[in-house]
């Protein structure tokens, strides 16, 4: 495969080129340090993948990615950056992967392998469509429909609809989804600010649940409820959150 590295820092380009040269799937590597040089190379060459930094001197890598996506045969875009805050936007642009600096050989190989497996398949440039049964209209935080979380220096993009519950214990926040569970040291409050209140309910100072995943509600001790969610996850509604919980589910 033919790769293009776009970064305005020579050391970053050299490091990435060194790691790519160790990968047998990469046959040829070219470099560019700015937008103009990148577009010129894309005009006269065909690349399978492009490693793209976000903070370029003359323009944002996000803006460049938008231009690349309009090309008839656009390369797979792998954002390679020191900043995690653009992860959601990157995946909205249908990026194949998002890698954080400093680079690691294993992580680079994972990204290359993704492209190698997908390069013969047509790229879907349509954005993810949110199921119609969820009404996000009153909550601006739901406009992205996804929650980025960082686990072991890797960012995972979780669809709101896949998240079953979030809970914290001994400083570790566990995010249970329909596919797997994730553990992170980020606070529950951090995630609460990013979740739409139209979909997620706080039932305890240490627990937030997705109301679309509530299967049954049982009366529990001290006039509280016990919830059974998707995959048989069970959580208790704290007495101090009972009133709000009933209101949000229309139980009053």
Swiss-Prot record:
<dbReference type="Pfam" id="PF04397">
    <property type="entry name" value="LytTR"/>
</dbReference>
<dbReference type="InterPro" id="IPR001789">
    <property type="entry name" value="Sig_transdc_resp-reg_receiver"/>
</dbReference>
<keyword id="KW-0238">DNA-binding</keyword>
<keyword id="KW-0804">Transcription</keyword>
<dbReference type="GO" id="GO:0003677">
    <property type="term" value="F:DNA binding"/>
</dbReference>
<feature type="domain" description="HTH LytTR-type">
    <location>
        <begin position="147"/>
        <end position="251"/>
    </location>
</feature>
<dbReference type="Pfam" id="PF00072">
    <property type="entry name" value="Response_reg"/>
</dbReference>
<dbReference type="InterPro" id="IPR007492">
    <property type="entry name" value="LytTR_DNA-bd_dom"/>
</dbReference>
<dbReference type="GO" id="GO:0005737">
    <property type="term" value="C:cytoplasm"/>
</dbReference>
<protein>
    <recommendedName>
        <fullName>Sensory transduction protein LytR</fullName>
    </recommendedName>
</protein>
<feature type="modified residue" description="4-aspartylphosphate">
    <location>
        <position position="53"/>
    </location>
</feature>
<dbReference type="InterPro" id="IPR046947">
    <property type="entry name" value="LytR-like"/>
</dbReference>
<dbReference type="GO" id="GO:0000156">
    <property type="term" value="F:phosphorelay response regulator activity"/>
</dbReference>
<keyword id="KW-0805">Transcription regulation</keyword>
<keyword id="KW-0597">Phosphoprotein</keyword>
<keyword id="KW-0902">Two-component regulatory system</keyword>
<feature type="domain" description="Response regulatory">
    <location>
        <begin position="2"/>
        <end position="116"/>
    </location>
</feature>
<keyword id="KW-0963">Cytoplasm</keyword>
<comment type="function">
    <text>Member of the two-component regulatory system LytR/LytS that probably regulates genes involved in cell wall metabolism.</text>
</comment>
<dbReference type="InterPro" id="IPR011006">
    <property type="entry name" value="CheY-like_superfamily"/>
</dbReference>
């Amino acid at each position: 495969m033919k790769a293009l590295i776009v970064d305005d820092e020579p050391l970053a380009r050299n490091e990435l080129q060194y790691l790519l040269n160790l990968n047998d799937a990469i046959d040829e590597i070219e470099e560019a340090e700015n937008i103009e040089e990148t577009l010129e190379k894309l005009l006269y060459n065909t690349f399978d993948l492009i490693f793209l930094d976000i903070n370029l001197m003359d323009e944002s890598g996000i803006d460049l990615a938008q231009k690349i996506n309009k090309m008839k045969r656009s390369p797979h875009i792998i954002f390679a950056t020191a900043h995690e805050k653009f992860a959601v936007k990157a995946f909205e642009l249908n990026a194949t992967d998002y890698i954080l600096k400093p680079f690691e050989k294993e992580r680079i190989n994972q990204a290359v392998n993704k492209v190698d497996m997908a390069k013969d398949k047509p790229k879907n440039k349509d954005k993810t469509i949110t199921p119609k049964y969820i009404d996000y209209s009153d909550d601006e935080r739901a406009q992205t429909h996804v929650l980025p979380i960082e686990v072991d220096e890797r960012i995972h993009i979780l669809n709101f609809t896949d998240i079953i519950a979030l809970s914290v214990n001994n400083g570790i926040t566990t995010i249970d989804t329909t596919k797997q569970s994730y553990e992170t040291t980020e606070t529950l409050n951090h995630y609460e600010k990013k979740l739409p209140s139209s979909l997620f309910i706080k039932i305890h100072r240490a627990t937030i649940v997705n109301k679309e995943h509530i299967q049954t509600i049982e009366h529990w001790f001290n006039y509280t409820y016990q919830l059974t969610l998707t995959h048989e996850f069970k959580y208790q509604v704290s007495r101090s959150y009972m009133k709000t919980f009933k209101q949000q589910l229309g139980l009053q």
